[in-house]
Curated annotation (Swiss-Prot):
CDD domains: CMPK
Protein name as it appears in the record: Cytidylate kinase
GO MF term (any one): CMP kinase activity
Alphabetical UniProt keywords: ATP-binding, Cytoplasm, Kinase, Nucleotide-binding, Transferase
Positions bound to ATP: 7-15
Reactions this protein catalyses: CMP + ATP = CDP + ADP; dCMP + ATP = dCDP + ADP
InterPro entries membership: Cytidylate_kin, Cytidylate_kinase_dom, P-loop_NTPase
The keyword ATP-binding is annotated on this UniProt entry: yes
GN (gene name): cmk
Classification lineage: Bacteria, Thermotogati, Deinococcota, Deinococci, Deinococcales
Coiled coil: none
Length: 206
């Protein structure tokens, strides 16, 4: 069984996906971490993130490995754990550029499709493009302000600046991030984490 949980940036996808995976006793897979890892490695190599061929060649020379765990994924490049650096502001600013490249999306999709089910897959287009035949699909959303307030609780940054960055990110991600026609859309704004997890588990159990 594959459960897909897509949604806009900072809508709670990672926390919800991890909670659902733990409740079901299956791994949780974060596609976004692969895009973030590609962005981090590109930045460290001083590559132009808009140059997809060079970036892809660099990634193939430094193969990435996603370690899917219910409590949170880790991404490795050889023996180096990239995970601690994946949520810095520079990566936030560049990841949409990387994710917009069809070649990079195809590369990430191939990594994900090689993983054996069952698992919970979290991302932007898991239910529409990567696993269109998944039997359980969900899409999380919330207003930019609510998402900014949540993110500011995790990082010492100004709420208004975070909100502006999220609105810009939403525009960049619009082509990739849309709910599948058969996905259940959940507004996480008025709900707590456990309530969202409970709604998804209830839907899966029906």
């Amino acid at each position: 069984m594959i459960v897909t949980i897509d949604g806009v940036a900072a809508s709670g996808k990672s926390s919800v996906s991890s909670g659902v995976a733990r409740a079901l006793g299956i791994p949780y897979v974060s596609s976004g971490l692969l895009y973030r890892a590609a962005t981090l490695l590109g930045l460290e190599a001083a590559l132009d993130l808009s140059d997809a061929p060079r970036l892809l060649a660099h990634l193939r020379a430094l193969p990435l490995r996603l370690e899917p765990l219910a409590e949170g994924n880790r991404v490795w490049s050889g023996e180096r754990d990239l995970t601690p650096g994946l949520h810095q502001s520079a990566v936030d600013a560049g990841v949409s550029t990387v994710a917009a490249h069809p070649e990079l999306r195809a590369w990430v999709d191939e990594q994900l499709r090689q993983l054996p089910p069952p698992f919970v897959a979290e991302g932007r287009d898991m239910g529409t493009n990567v696993f269109p035949d998944a039997p359980a699909k969900f899409y999380l959303t919330a207003s930019p302000r609510i998402r900014a307030e949540r993110r500011s609780a995790e990082r010492p940054e100004d709420v208004d600046a975070i909100e502006a960055a999220l609105i810009a990110r939403d525009r960049k991600d619009a082509a990739q991030s849309a709910p599948a026609p058969d996905a259940r859309v959940i507004d996480t704004g008025p709900l707590g984490l456990e309530e969202v997890i409970g709604e998804i588990l209830g839907e899966i159990g029906q």
